[in-house]
Amino acid sequence: MTGCVPRSWRPWFLRSGAMLACFLATGAAAQISIDIDETQRISFESGNFDVRRYSGEMQGVSYFVDNKLVMTADQIDLETGGQPKEGSFFVKSLEVINAEITGEDLLFSSAIARNVDFGVLLGEHSPVRNVSFDAGAAGFFDDSFLQVLGIEFSDELATVTVGNVETLDFVFDQLPTGERYARNGGLLIDDLRFDLGTVNREFKELADTLAARGLRAAEFDFAVSQIANFVGGELRAEHAFNLVMDEMASLELVSGFEVKLATLVALESMAAQGRAKESEMLNLIGGIELASLNATYLDAGLVDTLVDVMAAEQNVSPAEMRSSLRSMLTQTLEGMLPRNGRRMARPLETLLKQGGGLEVSVRPQQPIILSNFLGFLIMPDLALEQLGVTITHLRDQ
């Protein structure tokens, strides 16, 4: 794990974070309105803000770009370590209350930050810099904390609400070469809900079928976390991903990786230089090994719902659909994996027939270099055997 923020979410966080950092770094003294530059302006209705300390409070805040309102907030309370310096803007505490990003249909009820260097955080989020093992956590410290509550955003396809997003406890340490790494870190997201908006005509029948079975919205809780330690000349990291779909299913994924010290140093060097060649990145794969992987899926109605939906679409009974799926699954796996297909298919068939859950385990006799996975694609049967892959059906509790 290179940080605590999933990569696919970074553009949204960075766009909002960059705008907020520019917003706060300008200062506001006692004026009602301040021109930041030729295009940006901040105004607030009341408050007490000390531009020398870059600290204070503002109420009724508005942020404009090219005279267009971009963001509003009921209140902002800010305490910093002083004026921004080159590449650094340390925020001791920040609270933003009832903010709205205008034109984006995005708002949140509260955002809190403690002991975060926003200058470093925003400066480290280029694609090249993210090759660094620590880049995703740049700007954070052992006592850092971020939390956003009551997030809402929508478009014509869906409305998304998030009850709570917060960072888990950070613990940082140093490699023998002096580079920093995160021993502990992570992100927690509670009450993530997708409500379908306008459904395209070709999907309306499916949406109606799902709604009839109680799936008018999808609700999730999930967390990602990392535990890492430097042992015997390599960094051993365990990453965990937990996902719960309310009253439907849950998934836990735990992986273990081992990264050679020379590889970590090379990653840091690439990040510092601001460049990375594809050939260099491929060579580094030889220093990263998969030690273990375990996935546990527990079903609490999701499989039944999906089978019912497919049966309704094909105008057959759920029992017929289950039988058809089991046959298709067995034929497909036996065709792809002549030696192991039947063994892999059996627990999946049992899940379709009886419910319950699945545990997929990868336990190689010794850690597998990631570059070997290219060869495994050509010989999948051999891959399963060398990786020690097993699938076990879990009975319904």
PLM regions with names:
Residues 1-11:
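N-terminal secretory signal peptides that target proteins for export/translocation
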Residues 31-397:
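Glycine-rich, small/hydroxylated-residue low-complexity segments
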Residues 10-19:
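Sec-dependent signal peptide recognition
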Residues 25-27:
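N-terminal signal peptide c-region/cleavage motif recognized by signal peptidases
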